[in-house]
UniProtKB/Swiss-Prot annotation:
Belongs to the Fmt family. HAMAP family: Formyl_trans. Attaches a formyl group to the free amino group of methionyl-tRNA(fMet). The formyl group appears to play a dual role in the initiator identity of N-formylmethionyl-tRNA by promoting its recognition by IF2 and preventing the misappropriation of this tRNA by the elongation apparatus. (6S)-5,6,7,8-tetrahydrofolate binds at S111, L112, L113, P114. Its EC number is 2.1.2.9. NCBIfam families: fmt. GO terms for cellular component: cytosol. It catalyses: L-methionyl-tRNA(fMet) + (6R)-10-formyltetrahydrofolate = N-formyl-L-methionyl-tRNA(fMet) + (6S)-5,6,7,8-tetrahydrofolate + H(+). This is Methionyl-tRNA formyltransferase. GO terms for molecular function: methionyl-tRNA formyltransferase activity.
Amino acid sequence: MRILFMGTPEFAVPSLRAVAGAGPGFEVVMVVTGPDRPRRSRNSAPEPTPVKQAALELGLRVLEVEDVKDPAFASTVQELRPDVIVVAAFRILPPAVYGAARLGSFNLHASLLPAYRGAAPINHALMQGDRESGVTTFFLQQQVDTGNIILKRSTPVGSDENATELALRLSFIGAEAVLATLRLIAEGRADVSLQDESMASKAPKLTRQNTRIDWNRSAADLHNFIRGLSMRPAAWTTLGGKSVKIFRSAAAPQMSPSSPCAPGSLLIDDGRLYARGTDGWIELLLLQLEGKRPMEAPEFVRGFRPEVTEPQLV
């Protein structure tokens, strides 16, 4: 089976390694990824994508693509004569590309479809407080994340698990799912099921606007919002006119839920930092003030020593 693998971030690397090590009968003829770019900062030297780096370590051929809609890219894919195209955290492909695979093209998506279709499924699942997540493989079609499902793998989600931690776990669960999907296709046993549109939900791209904390929410919702965006891009708020990223929080059941303090109020108790929601408090554990490095709460507190209700997060 001639396999064309497409992916970019660290999430896709375990799947690439699994496919490359699939054994006799499976050949990765090319790895397609994005071009080298500055990744540490705008002025840093260009670096390869995690997928490119892994592919080179595995001795695989790499094709860097800027524009997947370029007809020349579709021609290159067709010339490779792939039996299957495997896509993991890449881009939206045109029909001329995904239609070039003899046995079909499938995508690895980090949710239990049809839930959380879109660019940020892991983040949105955690932000909603879901206690179960997983991955889905499905055949590509023109509408994004709507294709026929090949298989799913589910996993429970910890109450304090953040997006970075869950993404790492799902990357390895996804690698097993990709390999199982390839074997099903190779053996002609890839039975598919339609997605139930009545159960569909969206996971839109994360922006500056939709990652800002609204303190007029319950303490549980605030904790879920923060862990759903940790460590990147991170939930943020403002303090004294400056932006503050909050990377880690925890439930604070020991704090009295009844309080005259408004949502967003800060409280310091024995060097620990708490923020008020509509029905109680959460503890803030790791923060980063604009222009500063990330700090654990005790160090952060020493930097400004607020009173009980001042300053306030907004």
